[in-house]
Amino acid sequence: MKGLRSLAATTLALFLVFVFLGNSSCAPQRLLERRNWTPQAMLYLKGAQGRRFISDQSRRKDLSDRPLPERRSPNPQLLTIPEAATILLASLQKSPEDEEKNFDQTRFLEDSLLNW
């Protein structure tokens, strides 16, 4: 009888150990293990927790998929430094009389009357 009880207890203990090991193998091994989330689950997680759950790989992919920023002027003939310097100096050397000749006060008078 005593041998039968110890055999049953040993069998039950081994069974419980194997069941525990079998169930623990499907548990996440790491705290932040990457999972395959469905799109609906991702939308839920984004709404509930912000963008914390998006994986680093998808962030890197988003950055690599973006188009490169374009230049402001699509003109392929850019000014050289000496050309830009001469244009700047010419604009700085304009006399104040030339600017006053181009100044049209009637335009401002019409605008102020319209906005009155």
Curated annotation (Swiss-Prot):
Expressed in the type I glomic cells within the carotid body (at protein level). Expressed predominantly in pancreas, testis, kidney, brain and placenta. Expressed in submucosal layer of esophagus and stomach fundus. Residues 55-73 have a biased composition (Basic and acidic residues). Keywords: Amidation, Cleavage on pair of basic residues, Cytoplasmic vesicle, Hormone, Secreted, Signal. One of its GO terms (cellular component) is cytoplasm. Residues 1-26 form the signal peptide. The modification Glutamine amide is found at Q49. Plays a role as a central modulator of cardiovascular and renal function and nociception. Also plays a role in energy metabolism and storage. Inhibits adrenocortical cell proliferation with minor stimulation on corticosteroid release. Belongs to the spexin family. This is Spexin.
